[in-house]
Amino acid sequence: MATTERKPLLLDFEKPLAELANRIDQIRQLAEENGVDVSGEIRKLETRAMQLREEIFSTLSPSQRLQVARHPRRPSTLDYIQAISDEWMELHGDRCGGDDPALIGGVARLGGKPVVMLGHQKGRDTKDNIARNFGMATPGGYRKAMRLMEHANKFSMPILTFIDTPGALPTVVAERQGAGEAIAYNLREMFSLDVPIICTVIGEGGSGGALGIGVGDRLLMFEHSVYTVATPEACAAILWKDASKSPQAAVALKIVSHDLKNLGIIDQILPEPTGGAHSDPLTAATTLKQALLDNLDELDRLTSQERRQLRYDKFRKIGVFTEVAH
């Protein structure tokens, strides 16, 4: 995972932090030019900057957390795989003539154990994002994912999936190629796999595109990630015909980690470094690796039959069905 120092990309609610950082730089520069010792003042300002960062990121609204989840420098599936695995070999192709770059996967070792890792992959710049369809997988991508999961099941390797997509690719071509069928097939088959399955939402978890690799024994979620049936922008456009109402939609949709944990949809929230995972990718990767190892250790104690039953029960409990008397 790259750790090269780069100019930060600031979100709108981080502007007070940028102003404070500029003030510190100006004071430091003036002190150097005039030979004045202002180390005490700088320490106070740096302490204030740390406190302000913690205050801001501990009180983010759902729409602000969505901005963090979409941050261009947020660690991607490949970033995490390369950071946490001892060995990694990417496998290509859906065996139907396609190799979707928006959904990648392969075999790896985690803590010395062979596993299959797969997930959505966004790009780092405009050109890369276009090549990877902004992390929106094609039907072929979901078929490739299923091929890798069947490979894992055949060789008794746990499956680790990483979810980071606004949704499946919404094009006419994708519909003609069977997007709905490909996702539905994955949902059905993932319930029947014998090996442990751990799914982690590392960024955006959007709609059926997320569910296509999201059926597992455990569903983990980074603190500032989001998981939703539709993007807040799409929800606002559908309900109010006004995409500017997406902040209200984000609240109503319950897209953030603590709401989803309270609803019983996710199993564990992974804390992020103050400032988001992009501010300290290596710490975020360490947190993820430990959580995966701990959960794998627990799941390995169960039989395959117990895991399948618990997996089924977990999803059956989600949601509420109310019958209205006539």
Swiss-Prot record:
It is found in: Cytoplasm. Pfam families: ACCA (PF03255). SUPFAM superfamilies: ClpP/crotonase (SSF52096). Residues 44-298 form the CoA carboxyltransferase C-terminal domain. It catalyses: N(6)-carboxybiotinyl-L-lysyl-[protein] + acetyl-CoA = N(6)-biotinyl-L-lysyl-[protein] + malonyl-CoA. Pathway: Lipid metabolism; malonyl-CoA biosynthesis; malonyl-CoA from acetyl-CoA: step 1/1. Its main location: cytoplasm. Keywords: ATP-binding, Cytoplasm, Fatty acid biosynthesis, Fatty acid metabolism, Lipid biosynthesis, Lipid metabolism, Nucleotide-binding, Transferase. It is an enzyme of class 2 (transferase). Acetyl-CoA carboxylase is a heterohexamer composed of biotin carboxyl carrier protein (AccB), biotin carboxylase (AccC) and two subunits each of ACCase subunit alpha (AccA) and ACCase subunit beta (AccD). This is Acetyl-coenzyme A carboxylase carboxyl transferase subunit alpha. The gene is accA.
